[in-house]
Swiss-Prot record:
HAMAP family: Ribosomal_uS14_1. GO terms for cellular component: cytoplasm; small ribosomal subunit. SUPFAM superfamilies: Glucocorticoid receptor-like (DNA-binding domain) (SSF57716). One of its GO terms (molecular function) is rRNA binding. This is Small ribosomal subunit protein uS14. Binds 16S rRNA, required for the assembly of 30S particles and may also be responsible for determining the conformation of the 16S rRNA at the A site. Belongs to the universal ribosomal protein uS14 family. It holds the Pfam family Ribosomal_S14. InterPro entries: Ribosomal_uS14 (IPR001209), Ribosomal_uS14_bac/plastid (IPR023036). Keywords: Ribonucleoprotein, Ribosomal protein, RNA-binding, rRNA-binding. Coiled coil: none annotated.
Amino acid sequence: MAKLALIEREKKRAKLAAKFAPKRAALKAIIDDQEKSEEERYMARLELQQLPRNANPTRQRNRCAITGRPRGTFRKFGLARNKIREIAFKGEIPGLTKASW
């Protein structure tokens, strides 16, 4: 199990990214717009740099909702492969069965 501080840090990053998402999108639209003047685009770049570093969604790491494990996490379930296996064998995930051919 991952340390609780790491799990909480990821939650904080996700919350911060969600908070600044509209502002980041607006600034990036200005930066990408070729119709805008160079100075406007430059100022938008500077403003984007002033945003908190953890507001960038690429700094987020997918973690298991139960254990906090950072690797082997399935996006569809939000769980690590180990926990998916345990829960699937118990029959707690509807429609998920072990493959056999």
